[in-house]
Protein backbone atom coordinates (compact mmCIF):
# COMPACT_ATOMS: atom_id res chain seq x y z
CA UNK A 1 0.00 0.00 0.00
CA UNK A 2 1.48 3.29 -0.99
CA UNK A 3 2.50 5.87 1.50
CA UNK A 4 -0.34 8.20 0.61
CA UNK A 5 -2.90 6.22 2.52
CA UNK A 6 -0.75 6.44 5.59
CA UNK A 7 1.06 9.75 5.60
CA UNK A 8 2.84 11.17 8.57
CA UNK A 9 3.20 14.24 10.72
CA UNK A 10 5.10 17.10 9.08
CA UNK A 11 8.71 17.54 10.16
CA UNK A 12 10.89 20.59 10.45
CA UNK A 13 12.17 22.19 7.30
CA UNK A 14 15.81 22.04 6.29
CA UNK A 15 17.69 24.24 3.90
CA UNK A 16 19.67 21.44 2.30
CA UNK A 17 19.23 21.34 -1.47
CA UNK A 18 21.64 18.55 -2.31
CA UNK A 19 23.06 15.43 -0.65
CA UNK A 20 25.68 16.00 2.01
CA UNK A 21 28.37 13.34 2.16
CA UNK A 22 31.04 12.45 4.67
CA UNK A 23 33.10 9.43 5.63
CA UNK A 24 31.82 9.25 9.18
CA UNK A 25 30.70 5.90 10.61
CA UNK A 26 27.67 5.49 12.80
CA UNK A 27 27.45 3.61 16.05
CA UNK A 28 25.03 1.46 17.97
CA UNK A 29 22.06 -0.27 16.39
CA UNK A 30 18.67 0.77 17.78
CA UNK A 31 15.34 -1.02 17.58
CA UNK A 32 12.56 1.54 17.44
CA UNK A 33 9.21 0.65 18.97
CA UNK A 34 7.31 3.57 17.52
CA UNK A 35 6.09 5.06 14.30
CA UNK A 36 7.88 7.65 12.25
CA UNK A 37 5.89 10.39 13.92
CA UNK A 38 8.47 10.64 16.65
CA UNK A 39 11.20 13.03 15.68
CA UNK A 40 13.47 12.01 18.56
CA UNK A 41 14.29 8.72 16.88
CA UNK A 42 15.19 10.31 13.60
CA UNK A 43 17.34 12.98 15.20
CA UNK A 44 19.21 10.35 17.19
CA UNK A 45 19.90 8.46 14.00
CA UNK A 46 21.08 11.59 12.26
CA UNK A 47 23.47 12.36 15.08
CA UNK A 48 24.90 8.90 14.87
CA UNK A 49 23.81 6.26 17.29
CA UNK A 50 22.44 7.62 20.55
CA UNK A 51 19.74 5.32 21.76
CA UNK A 52 16.38 6.83 20.95
CA UNK A 53 13.71 7.32 23.57
CA UNK A 54 10.67 5.07 23.19
CA UNK A 55 8.05 7.76 22.89
CA UNK A 56 4.33 7.33 22.44
CA UNK A 57 2.77 7.37 19.03
CA UNK A 58 1.23 10.76 18.34
CA UNK A 59 -1.92 10.82 16.24
CA UNK A 60 -2.69 13.71 13.88
CA UNK A 61 -4.74 14.06 10.72
CA UNK A 62 -1.57 13.36 8.74
CA UNK A 63 -0.29 10.48 10.88
CA UNK A 64 0.16 6.95 9.45
CA UNK A 65 -2.98 4.93 9.99
CA UNK A 66 -3.75 1.25 10.19
CA UNK A 67 -7.13 0.32 8.76
CA UNK A 68 -9.86 -2.16 9.57
CA UNK A 69 -13.29 -2.68 8.02
CA UNK A 70 -16.60 -4.52 8.28
CA UNK A 71 -15.43 -8.00 7.33
CA UNK A 72 -18.96 -9.44 7.42
CA UNK A 73 -20.04 -6.90 4.81
CA UNK A 74 -16.93 -7.75 2.77
CA UNK A 75 -17.91 -11.41 2.81
CA UNK A 76 -21.40 -10.54 1.57
CA UNK A 77 -20.02 -8.34 -1.22
CA UNK A 78 -17.88 -11.16 -2.59
CA UNK A 79 -20.35 -13.98 -2.13
CA UNK A 80 -20.97 -15.27 -5.66
CA UNK A 81 -24.46 -16.42 -4.72
CA UNK A 82 -25.46 -12.95 -3.52
CA UNK A 83 -23.56 -10.73 -5.95
CA UNK A 84 -24.18 -11.71 -9.56
CA UNK A 85 -22.02 -8.82 -10.83
CA UNK A 86 -18.80 -10.55 -9.84
CA UNK A 87 -16.69 -11.21 -12.91
CA UNK A 88 -14.83 -14.30 -11.75
CA UNK A 89 -12.98 -14.65 -15.06
CA UNK A 90 -11.41 -11.21 -14.54
CA UNK A 91 -10.42 -12.14 -11.01
CA UNK A 92 -8.94 -15.40 -12.32
CA UNK A 93 -6.82 -13.44 -14.81
CA UNK A 94 -5.64 -11.12 -12.07
CA UNK A 95 -4.86 -14.09 -9.84
CA UNK A 96 -2.56 -15.54 -12.48
CA UNK A 97 -0.78 -12.18 -12.65
CA UNK A 98 -0.17 -12.21 -8.92
CA UNK A 99 0.88 -15.86 -8.90
CA UNK A 100 3.54 -15.10 -11.51
CA UNK A 101 5.25 -12.97 -8.85
CA UNK A 102 7.39 -10.91 -11.18
CA UNK A 103 9.33 -9.38 -8.29
CA UNK A 104 10.13 -12.59 -6.43
CA UNK A 105 13.88 -12.08 -6.85
CA UNK A 106 13.87 -8.31 -7.29
CA UNK A 107 14.27 -7.11 -3.71
CA UNK A 108 17.81 -8.35 -3.13
CA UNK A 109 20.18 -6.00 -1.35
CA UNK A 110 23.86 -5.48 -2.05
CA UNK A 111 26.77 -3.72 -0.37
CA UNK A 112 25.86 -0.42 -2.06
CA UNK A 113 23.18 0.22 0.56
CA UNK A 114 25.39 0.41 3.64
CA UNK A 115 28.16 2.21 1.79
CA UNK A 116 25.72 4.87 0.54
CA UNK A 117 24.08 5.27 3.95
CA UNK A 118 27.43 5.86 5.63
CA UNK A 119 28.09 8.74 3.23
CA UNK A 120 24.77 10.51 3.86
CA UNK A 121 25.12 13.02 6.68
CA UNK A 122 23.34 15.90 8.34
CA UNK A 123 19.72 16.87 7.59
CA UNK A 124 19.50 14.60 4.54
CA UNK A 125 20.37 11.58 6.69
CA UNK A 126 17.55 12.46 9.07
CA UNK A 127 15.12 12.81 6.18
CA UNK A 128 16.13 9.47 4.65
CA UNK A 129 15.41 7.78 7.97
CA UNK A 130 11.97 9.43 8.15
CA UNK A 131 11.26 8.47 4.55
CA UNK A 132 12.10 4.83 5.29
CA UNK A 133 10.15 4.80 8.56
CA UNK A 134 6.92 6.23 7.18
CA UNK A 135 7.12 4.13 4.00
CA UNK A 136 7.75 0.96 6.00
CA UNK A 137 4.84 1.74 8.32
CA UNK A 138 2.50 2.36 5.38
CA UNK A 139 3.49 -0.86 3.59
CA UNK A 140 3.11 -2.83 6.82
CA UNK A 141 -0.38 -1.42 7.40
CA UNK A 142 -1.33 -2.67 3.93
CA UNK A 143 0.09 -6.09 4.74
CA UNK A 144 -2.08 -6.41 7.86
CA UNK A 145 -5.29 -5.34 6.12
CA UNK A 146 -4.77 -7.54 3.05
CA UNK A 147 -3.75 -10.53 5.16
CA UNK A 148 -6.94 -10.33 7.23
CA UNK A 149 -9.11 -9.92 4.12
CA UNK A 150 -7.44 -12.97 2.58
CA UNK A 151 -8.21 -14.98 5.70
CA UNK A 152 -11.82 -13.82 6.07
CA UNK A 153 -12.80 -14.29 2.41
CA UNK A 154 -11.26 -17.75 1.97
CA UNK A 155 -14.59 -19.60 2.21
CA UNK A 156 -16.76 -16.96 0.54
CA UNK A 157 -14.62 -16.34 -2.54
CA UNK A 158 -11.33 -18.30 -2.65
CA UNK A 159 -10.08 -16.50 -5.78
CA UNK A 160 -10.47 -13.00 -4.34
CA UNK A 161 -9.13 -14.23 -1.00
CA UNK A 162 -5.98 -15.60 -2.62
CA UNK A 163 -5.38 -12.30 -4.44
CA UNK A 164 -5.57 -10.44 -1.13
CA UNK A 165 -3.14 -12.94 0.38
CA UNK A 166 -0.71 -12.45 -2.51
CA UNK A 167 -0.99 -8.68 -2.17
CA UNK A 168 -0.15 -9.05 1.52
CA UNK A 169 2.93 -10.97 0.36
CA UNK A 170 3.94 -7.97 -1.76
CA UNK A 171 3.35 -5.50 1.06
CA UNK A 172 5.31 -7.63 3.54
CA UNK A 173 8.17 -7.83 1.06
CA UNK A 174 8.16 -4.04 0.64
CA UNK A 175 7.99 -3.41 4.40
CA UNK A 176 10.79 -5.88 5.08
CA UNK A 177 12.98 -4.34 2.40
CA UNK A 178 12.44 -0.86 3.81
CA UNK A 179 13.01 -2.01 7.38
CA UNK A 180 16.24 -3.68 6.32
CA UNK A 181 17.20 -0.36 4.76
CA UNK A 182 16.78 1.26 8.17
CA UNK A 183 19.52 -1.05 9.43
CA UNK A 184 21.88 0.87 7.14
CA UNK A 185 21.17 3.82 9.45
CA UNK A 186 21.49 1.61 12.58
CA UNK A 187 17.74 1.50 13.19
CA UNK A 188 14.86 -0.94 12.78
CA UNK A 189 11.12 -0.62 13.35
CA UNK A 190 9.61 -3.13 15.78
CA UNK A 191 6.75 -4.16 13.50
CA UNK A 192 5.30 -6.56 16.06
CA UNK A 193 5.01 -3.72 18.53
CA UNK A 194 3.40 -1.52 15.88
CA UNK A 195 0.79 -4.21 15.23
CA UNK A 196 -0.31 -4.17 18.87
CA UNK A 197 0.23 -0.51 19.72
CA UNK A 198 -1.34 1.24 16.76
CA UNK A 199 -4.88 2.54 16.75
CA UNK A 200 -6.95 1.15 13.90
CA UNK A 201 -9.16 3.44 11.81
CA UNK A 202 -12.47 1.89 10.72
CA UNK A 203 -13.52 2.33 7.09
CA UNK A 204 -16.61 0.85 5.48
CA UNK A 205 -15.72 -1.50 2.59
CA UNK A 206 -16.62 0.99 -0.14
CA UNK A 207 -14.34 3.58 1.45
CA UNK A 208 -11.55 1.01 1.61
CA UNK A 209 -12.03 0.48 -2.14
CA UNK A 210 -11.90 4.20 -3.01
CA UNK A 211 -8.99 5.05 -0.72
CA UNK A 212 -6.87 2.00 -1.48
CA UNK A 213 -7.34 2.28 -5.23
CA UNK A 214 -6.09 5.87 -5.05
CA UNK A 215 -3.28 4.91 -2.68
CA UNK A 216 -1.94 2.21 -4.98
CA UNK A 217 -2.21 4.27 -8.16
CA UNK A 218 -0.66 7.38 -6.66
CA UNK A 219 2.11 5.18 -5.30
CA UNK A 220 2.76 3.92 -8.83
CA UNK A 221 3.12 7.44 -10.19
CA UNK A 222 5.35 8.56 -7.32
CA UNK A 223 7.74 5.64 -7.72
CA UNK A 224 7.97 5.66 -11.50
CA UNK A 225 8.43 9.45 -11.59
CA UNK A 226 11.31 9.32 -9.10
CA UNK A 227 12.85 6.37 -10.95
CA UNK A 228 12.71 8.13 -14.33
CA UNK A 229 14.09 11.36 -12.90
CA UNK A 230 17.08 9.65 -11.28
CA UNK A 231 17.77 7.60 -14.39
CA UNK A 232 18.07 10.86 -16.33
CA UNK A 233 19.98 12.60 -13.51
CA UNK A 234 22.27 9.95 -11.98
CA UNK A 235 24.24 12.56 -10.03
CA UNK A 236 21.31 12.63 -7.56
CA UNK A 237 21.27 8.83 -7.10
CA UNK A 238 22.56 9.00 -3.52
CA UNK A 239 20.92 5.82 -2.17
CA UNK A 240 20.32 2.59 -4.13
CA UNK A 241 16.73 1.97 -3.02
CA UNK A 242 15.56 4.23 -5.85
CA UNK A 243 17.01 1.81 -8.42
CA UNK A 244 14.34 -0.69 -7.33
CA UNK A 245 11.41 1.64 -7.99
CA UNK A 246 10.85 0.61 -11.63
CA UNK A 247 9.79 -2.93 -10.69
CA UNK A 248 8.41 -1.89 -7.33
CA UNK A 249 5.90 0.47 -8.91
CA UNK A 250 4.44 -2.40 -10.92
CA UNK A 251 3.33 -4.06 -7.68
CA UNK A 252 1.47 -0.85 -6.86
CA UNK A 253 -0.05 -0.78 -10.34
CA UNK A 254 -1.26 -4.38 -10.14
CA UNK A 255 -2.78 -3.74 -6.73
CA UNK A 256 -4.62 -0.73 -8.15
CA UNK A 257 -5.89 -2.80 -11.08
CA UNK A 258 -7.30 -5.31 -8.62
CA UNK A 259 -9.18 -2.62 -6.71
CA UNK A 260 -10.47 -1.31 -10.03
CA UNK A 261 -11.91 -4.78 -10.67
CA UNK A 262 -13.42 -4.82 -7.17
CA UNK A 263 -15.15 -1.49 -7.83
CA UNK A 264 -16.51 -2.71 -11.17
CA UNK A 265 -17.93 -5.73 -9.34
CA UNK A 266 -19.87 -3.34 -7.08
CA UNK A 267 -21.61 -0.93 -9.51
CA UNK A 268 -23.54 0.64 -6.63
CA UNK A 269 -20.24 2.25 -5.62
CA UNK A 270 -19.88 3.91 -9.04
CA UNK A 271 -23.22 4.70 -10.61
CA UNK A 272 -25.11 7.23 -8.49
CA UNK A 273 -24.77 10.77 -7.19
CA UNK A 274 -23.42 9.59 -3.83
CA UNK A 275 -20.62 7.73 -5.59
CA UNK A 276 -19.66 10.93 -7.40
CA UNK A 277 -19.50 12.87 -4.14
CA UNK A 278 -17.45 10.20 -2.38
CA UNK A 279 -15.10 9.86 -5.35
CA UNK A 280 -14.34 13.57 -5.29
CA UNK A 281 -13.94 13.50 -1.51
CA UNK A 282 -11.33 10.75 -1.57
CA UNK A 283 -9.46 12.35 -4.46
CA UNK A 284 -9.32 15.59 -2.48
CA UNK A 285 -8.25 13.84 0.73
CA UNK A 286 -5.42 11.89 -0.89
CA UNK A 287 -4.11 14.74 -3.05
CA UNK A 288 -4.18 17.37 -0.29
CA UNK A 289 -2.61 15.06 2.29
CA UNK A 290 0.25 14.22 -0.05
CA UNK A 291 0.80 17.86 -1.01
CA UNK A 292 0.84 19.14 2.58
CA UNK A 293 3.17 16.40 3.75
CA UNK A 294 5.59 16.73 0.87
CA UNK A 295 5.75 20.51 1.20
CA UNK A 296 7.00 19.95 4.76
CA UNK A 297 9.74 17.67 3.37
CA UNK A 298 11.14 19.72 0.54
CA UNK A 299 14.69 18.88 1.62
CA UNK A 300 14.12 15.23 0.69
CA UNK A 301 12.92 16.02 -2.83
CA UNK A 302 15.49 18.75 -3.36
CA UNK A 303 18.13 16.29 -2.16
CA UNK A 304 17.32 14.05 -5.12
CA UNK A 305 17.05 16.97 -7.53
CA UNK A 306 13.27 17.42 -7.67
CA UNK A 307 11.11 20.50 -7.23
CA UNK A 308 8.60 19.34 -4.61
CA UNK A 309 5.53 21.15 -5.90
CA UNK A 310 6.22 20.34 -9.55
CA UNK A 311 6.74 16.68 -8.63
CA UNK A 312 3.51 16.54 -6.63
CA UNK A 313 1.44 18.23 -9.32
CA UNK A 314 2.77 15.83 -11.96
CA UNK A 315 1.86 12.87 -9.72
CA UNK A 316 -1.59 14.30 -8.94
CA UNK A 317 -2.40 15.01 -12.60
CA UNK A 318 -1.31 11.57 -13.80
CA UNK A 319 -3.11 9.83 -10.93
CA UNK A 320 -6.25 11.83 -11.64
CA UNK A 321 -6.19 10.88 -15.32
CA UNK A 322 -5.82 7.21 -14.37
CA UNK A 323 -8.56 7.46 -11.75
CA UNK A 324 -10.95 9.06 -14.24
CA UNK A 325 -11.15 5.70 -16.02
CA UNK A 326 -13.04 4.16 -13.10
CA UNK A 327 -14.32 6.86 -10.70
CA UNK A 328 -17.61 8.49 -11.80
CA UNK A 329 -16.25 11.96 -11.05
CA UNK A 330 -12.82 13.42 -10.31
CA UNK A 331 -11.42 16.82 -9.41
CA UNK A 332 -10.37 19.26 -12.11
CA UNK A 333 -6.74 19.23 -10.95
CA UNK A 334 -5.47 20.82 -14.17
CA UNK A 335 -7.44 23.97 -13.44
CA UNK A 336 -4.89 26.57 -12.16
CA UNK A 337 -7.31 27.39 -9.34
CA UNK A 338 -6.73 23.90 -7.89
CA UNK A 339 -3.00 24.46 -7.38
CA UNK A 340 -3.56 27.98 -6.10
CA UNK A 341 -5.78 26.58 -3.36
CA UNK A 342 -3.29 23.82 -2.56
CA UNK A 343 -0.57 26.43 -2.07
CA UNK A 344 -2.88 28.45 0.17
CA UNK A 345 -3.46 25.35 2.30
CA UNK A 346 0.30 24.88 2.59
CA UNK A 347 0.61 28.43 3.95
CA UNK A 348 -2.15 27.83 6.51
CA UNK A 349 -0.68 24.49 7.54
CA UNK A 350 2.71 26.13 8.11
CA UNK A 351 1.03 28.68 10.38
CA UNK A 352 -0.64 25.85 12.31
CA UNK A 353 2.71 24.15 12.77
CA UNK A 354 4.26 27.42 13.94
CA UNK A 355 1.56 27.77 16.61
CA UNK A 356 2.37 24.29 17.87
CA UNK A 357 6.04 25.20 18.25
CA UNK A 358 5.41 28.27 20.42
CA UNK A 359 5.84 28.27 24.20
CA UNK A 360 2.23 29.35 24.77
CA UNK A 361 0.04 27.39 27.15
CA UNK A 362 -2.29 24.81 25.49
CA UNK A 363 -5.37 27.03 25.87
CA UNK A 364 -3.73 29.92 24.03
CA UNK A 365 -2.43 27.59 21.32
CA UNK A 366 -5.91 26.18 20.76
CA UNK A 367 -7.42 29.66 20.53
CA UNK A 368 -4.81 30.64 17.94
CA UNK A 369 -5.54 27.48 15.96
CA UNK A 370 -9.29 28.10 15.64
CA UNK A 371 -9.19 30.74 12.86
CA UNK A 372 -6.46 28.81 11.03
CA UNK A 373 -8.43 25.57 11.12
CA UNK A 374 -11.49 27.47 9.90
CA UNK A 375 -9.46 28.95 7.04
CA UNK A 376 -8.10 25.52 6.10
CA UNK A 377 -11.59 24.01 6.18
CA UNK A 378 -12.84 26.85 3.98
CA UNK A 379 -10.12 26.18 1.39
CA UNK A 380 -10.87 22.45 1.44
CA UNK A 381 -14.58 23.05 0.93
CA UNK A 382 -13.98 25.55 -1.87
CA UNK A 383 -11.66 23.08 -3.61
CA UNK A 384 -14.19 20.28 -3.22
CA UNK A 385 -16.94 22.47 -4.70
CA UNK A 386 -14.95 23.37 -7.81
CA UNK A 387 -16.77 22.05 -10.92
CA UNK A 388 -15.72 18.40 -11.22
CA UNK A 389 -14.94 16.32 -14.28
CA UNK A 390 -17.60 13.72 -15.03
CA UNK A 391 -15.78 10.51 -15.82
CA UNK A 392 -15.60 6.75 -15.42
CA UNK A 393 -17.43 3.82 -16.90
CA UNK A 394 -18.04 0.24 -15.83
CA UNK A 395 -18.14 -0.82 -19.48
CA UNK A 396 -14.54 -1.96 -19.69
CA UNK A 397 -12.92 -4.35 -22.12
CA UNK A 398 -11.89 -7.72 -20.76
CA UNK A 399 -8.85 -7.57 -18.50
CA UNK A 400 -5.55 -7.87 -20.32
CA UNK A 401 -2.41 -7.96 -18.17
CA UNK A 402 0.02 -5.25 -19.18
CA UNK A 403 2.81 -3.11 -17.84
CA UNK A 404 2.17 0.61 -17.66
CA UNK A 405 5.04 3.10 -17.90
UniProtKB/Swiss-Prot annotation:
TM region positions: none
Recorded metabolic or biological pathway in which this protein acts: Porphyrin-containing compound metabolism; chlorophyll biosynthesis
Biological process annotations from GO: chlorophyll biosynthetic process; photosynthesis
Domain of life of the organism encoding this protein: Eukaryota
Enzyme Commission number(s) of this protein: 1.14.13.81
Keywords: Chlorophyll biosynthesis, Chloroplast, Iron, Metal-binding, NADP, Oxidoreductase, Photosynthesis, Plastid, Transit peptide
Cellular component per GO, a single term: chloroplast thylakoid membrane
Compartments where located: Plastid, Chloroplast
Cofactor: Fe cation
CDD domains on file: ACSF (cd01047)
Gene Ontology terms for molecular function: magnesium-protoporphyrin IX monomethyl ester (oxidative) cyclase activity; metal ion binding
NCBIfam families documented for this protein: AcsF, PRK13654.1
Protein name (database record): Magnesium-protoporphyrin IX monomethyl ester [oxidative] cyclase, chloroplastic
Organism encoding this protein: Gossypium hirsutum
Organism phylogeny: Eukaryota, Viridiplantae, Streptophyta, Embryophyta, Tracheophyta
Gene name for this UniProt entry: CRD1
Amino acid sequence: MATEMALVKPISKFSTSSPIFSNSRYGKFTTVRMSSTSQSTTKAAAKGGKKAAKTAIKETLLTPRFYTTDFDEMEALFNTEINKNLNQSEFESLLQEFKTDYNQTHFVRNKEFKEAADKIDGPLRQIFVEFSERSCTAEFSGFLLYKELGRRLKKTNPVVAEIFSLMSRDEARHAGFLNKGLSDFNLALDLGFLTKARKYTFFKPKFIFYATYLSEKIGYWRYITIYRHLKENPEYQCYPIFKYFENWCQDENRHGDFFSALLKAQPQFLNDWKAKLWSRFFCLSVYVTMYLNDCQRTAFYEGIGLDTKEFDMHVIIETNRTTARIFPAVLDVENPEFKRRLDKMVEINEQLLAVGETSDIPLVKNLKRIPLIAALASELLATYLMPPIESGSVDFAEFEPQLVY
